[in-house]
Amino acid sequence: MTSGMAQTVCGLLQPQKLGRTLTHEHMVMDYKSCYFKPSREQDLHLCSKKEITMQNLYWLRQNPYSNAFNLSLGDEPLEEIIAEVAEFKKEGGSTIVDNTTYGIMRNVEALKKISMATDVNIICGTGYYLDHTLPPEIKNAPIEELTQKMVNELTVGVEGTNIKCGVIGEVGCSWPLTPIEKKSLQASAAAQAETGAPLIIHPGRDESAPEEIIRILQEAGGDISRTVMSHTDRTIFNRSKLVELAATGCYVEWDLFGMETLFYQANLASDMPSDSQRIQDIKFLLDEGYEDKIVIAHDIHTRHRLKKYGGHGYAHIMVDIVPKMLMRGVTQEQIDKIQIANPRTWLTFK
């Protein structure tokens, strides 16, 4: 029985063994379906480069979705990504939730190899990503079929393996929601109700998106208290909206630590906050009394953010962010809640 347990790619785990947890990352994925043409015609020659160098690294930081090589993580052999995850372990990390779902090339067998090589607990996700990444057979499937596929991956195994998912999501949502994305949300809520699994959402890029998503989940029988709303740092810029979101009972996730860029390529109209601003917003929500509902991560989903290529890697929060949080008045007890207690509560099957 999964009730009262967490479920990793290597099997069931006592929740108290989860330790310091990154709640939203990717280790093995193909994000080429989310390619963006660069805004400058003269930069088109950089899109096909199959290497990351000192000469193109800054350009990639501003245009991460315009280079195919950058949009692939965890290529075989797995030594590159194993070394990156091992850095997280070395700095005191224990568990990573891989949010790669149907549409962006999840590979659960590779995740199990990474877990066994690094002794890091890895929890993989079931569910469906954004509309444009999904094939017609998924878009045309009834809710019941979408639900059953997720239930099977949570209780039986993924694609003929005995590797089971331990979370639903990240469930992809655009703004405005498309019909398949609404159907995916409804199916995710139904799968959560049936299995007791934790749920995590990728909201559309609008401050009203989380509110609409929560309403749909509630109407479909989802448990908001066991749901993470991802990407707060690129979605909500009004602190009153931030409090409204936390008041719904969901977990509020800042998951783009390390991503500091002048232009956020997926939404050029928004101003991506710095890590310092993320910490300030977290401190604000802590002071509002929501320390039990905050989780954090990096959402690494492009190669240039790995240490090998001059990026911050999976240990950035452990090495750089936690000390800065302490300097800004966040207590060690609050940090332990954010990194250990809150993820543990969320990841424990009901």
Curated annotation (Swiss-Prot):
The keyword Metal-binding applies. GO terms for biological process: catabolic process. It holds the Pfam family PTE. Keywords: Hydrolase, Metal-binding. Binds 2 divalent metal cations per subunit. Its cofactor is a divalent metal cation. This is Phosphotriesterase-related protein. The lineage of its organism: Eukaryota, Metazoa, Cnidaria, Anthozoa, Hexacorallia.
